[in-house]
């Protein structure tokens, strides 16, 4: 889960692989889970039940969790629990927010088929470039006019390619974009609207469209009961006044969502920004990303504490 970023931090644990670095904290996640494993093994005789510990790959591309699920590694699991470091939260604080926390992530490609002609006779062709530009503009109306202002919806086009030469009506065009939503219902409605609008716009100018979709991850919706259980542990680890229960949802995705769909669960966000230290406050996916390592102790205590507490209360 390293990212294709050249690390610029000058630290002993700087990436040894040119052009890639851990710029989102997945190395910290693995370290904290290993620490929790050590505690759990040392106290295995005091634990009533079975604990499945997943060191999951491929979160950054959105398919790792489904590989674990498809292989039955979370079958018959009563609770799921995970944690992610956050440079937006001060060290010593934990977000255990029920409900939507992260958006679904869908990638799409729209191909527009037109017909080439000389630019002096546009009526003899079908301008795929013009059609594509109208699709880009019109699908923004999904957010502005077809979605409730109370719903968090994002439709973004990041790539558009069309045309062969300045004096030829473009015979084809392609665009790539993403859809981000916080609920399955809004997600379904938005995807349907994109296809409907693009198809109708293309038909209006004599063109045709085709679609490709990739479903990277579902919306991450924390189970309320699981959050309350985790909060009881966090009360001991960091104190009740350091528990955040109203973190604003993010439109970035996380495939921890897939586990929570299978069994009730909670995904917490551990503060990794040391107060007064700008280096640990750098945004994720940045070449200077780093953490306050004190946050690892919090993560270790939460992982081990929640597992032991839940199993012993439900033995």
Predicted regions and their residues:
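Long, structured ligand/cofactor-binding scaffold of large enzymes
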Residues: 1
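Histidine/acidic-residue-rich, glycine-tolerant segments that coordinate divalent metal ions
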Residues: 4, 9-21, 27-28, 33, ...
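Alpha-helix C-terminal capping segments
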Residues: 35-45, 260-262
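Membrane-embedded catalytic cores of phosphoryl/pyrophosphoryl-handling enzymes
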Residues: 38, 49-52, 177
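Short, well-ordered alpha-helices that flank and scaffold nucleotide-derived cofactor binding pockets
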Residues: 38, 42, 70, 305-308
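Residues in and immediately flanking transmembrane alpha helices
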Residues: 39-40, 97, 131, 268
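Hydrophobic residues in beta-strands and at strand termini
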Residues: 41, 57, 112-114, 181, ...
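Metal-dependent amide/peptide-bond hydrolase catalytic core
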Residues: 133-315
């Amino acid at each position: 889960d390293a990212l294709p970023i050249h690390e610029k931090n000058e630290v002993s644990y700087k990436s040894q692989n040119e052009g890639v670095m851990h710029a989102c904290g997945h190395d910290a996640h693995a370290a904290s889970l290993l620490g929790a494993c050590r505690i759990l093994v040392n106290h295995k005789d005091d634990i009533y039940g079975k604990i499945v510990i997943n060191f999951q790959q491929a979160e950054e591309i959105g398919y790792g969790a489904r590989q674990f699920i498809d292989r039955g590694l979370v079958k018959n699991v009563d609770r799921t629990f995970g944690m992610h470091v956050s440079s937006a939260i001060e060290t010593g604080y934990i977000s255990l927010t029920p409900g939507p926390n992260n958006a679904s992530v869908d990638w799409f490609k729209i191909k527009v088929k037109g017909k080439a002609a000389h630019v002096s006779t546009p009526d003899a062709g079908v301008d795929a470039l013009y059609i594509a530009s109208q699709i880009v503009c019109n699908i923004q109306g999904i957010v502005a006019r077809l979605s409730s202002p109370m719903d968090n919806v994002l439709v973004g086009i990041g790539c558009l390619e069309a045309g062969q030469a300045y004096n030829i009506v473009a015979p084809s065009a392609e665009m790539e974009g993403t859809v981000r939503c916080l609920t399955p219902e809004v997600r379904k409605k938005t995807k349907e609207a994109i296809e409907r609008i693009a198809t109708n716009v293309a038909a209006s100018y004599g063109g045709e469209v085709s679609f490709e979709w990739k479903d990277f991850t579902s919306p991450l919706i924390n189970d309320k009961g699981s959050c309350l259980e985790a909060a009881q542990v966090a009360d001991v680890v960091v104190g009740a006044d350091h528990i955040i229960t109203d973190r604003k949802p993010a439109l970035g995705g996380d495939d921890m969502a897939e586990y929570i769909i299978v069994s009730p669960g909670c995904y917490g966000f551990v503060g990794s920004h040391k107060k007064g230290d700008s280096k640990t406050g750098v945004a994720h996916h940045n070449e200077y990303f780093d953490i306050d390592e004190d946050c690892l102790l919090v993560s270790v205590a939460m992982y081990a504490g929640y597992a032991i507490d839940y199993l012993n209360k439900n033995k």
